[in-house]
């Protein structure tokens, strides 16, 4: 959803669907009669000449946003004399006039072409025309020129009189371009300031933006502050392992566009682990792009005595491993041999006693 246009907003003025393509008002031309004239050409926000939307002298509106039928003035931002659009000298071209007081020729009525249902507000990117209050004149783009580009030749309902506003000032416009705001990219007023081109122009812009809004913008999944990735940072970068970034349409820095992810994703549930001869095997789990150093040495586990004797600890052989193994294999035969030996000795003793 695009933002509403408010009085006192700084904007870029565009003619998006002219016979010459998408046009942005970019400068002023100088004439012999002493009055400057707005000029426009195909270009980007970096070429744009920003304007401020103001309430005309003698008017007041309770609503802060510009609405269909409101009177506005377009005042050049980079003009110490507050030059504004003016229906002036009669030669048929839109002028810039300085320090204009109450004057109908400087006042323009907003005519939204397709207003939304039950909403008369003007939105950024929405198409509209302007009508001069003093005369029936629609500003109409005639062609790129160093002298004048915007004609006032009466009423005009062609594509050349269709206008559109983009959010300013320039830093705001760059951010909207980097966020791939469609009113900036269709048609293209952004050039290299596109978040999807990975040109590098948007790296700092998007990083600073995501540091401020964090997860309130779900498309910041690749560019969140480092504290949001502490659990996984030892395994790999977010563009390789974080589900807020991988396989999403999130904003990315140029270094994240074609990541080299050599990550082994290990997930072992010890409760479901079915092992045998655990005390005779060393298990080593390594997750990440490379082996990680062993953790700090902790206390050596010791056997605990259970009802059936000492409980072996995995990885540590029993203290008397050899004797335990010996008796577990030959204990029964040793006992039988001892019994037989006792019987034989007893029999021999009885024999000699009876003699």
Swiss-Prot record:
Subcellular localization(s) per the UniProt record: Host membrane; Virion
Sugar-bearing residue positions: 20, 78, 87, 156, 159, 274, 320
Domain of life: Viruses
Pfam families xrefs: Pox_G9-A16
Listed Pro residues bias regions: 296-317
Bilayer-spanning residue ranges: 332-352
GO CC annotation, single: membrane
Keyword check for Cell division: no
Intravirion compartment segments: 353-355
Protein's membrane topology: Single-pass type I membrane protein
Residues spanning the signal sequence: 1-21
Stretch list, region Disordered: 288-317
Residues in the Virion surface compartment per record: 22-331
UniProt keywords, alphabetically: Glycoprotein, Host membrane, Membrane, Signal, Transmembrane, Transmembrane helix, Virion
KW Transmembrane helix (keyword) present: yes
Name this polypeptide is given: Uncharacterized protein L65
Native source species: Acanthamoeba polyphaga mimivirus (APMV)
High-level lineage: Viruses, Varidnaviria, Bamfordvirae, Nucleocytoviricota, Megaviricetes
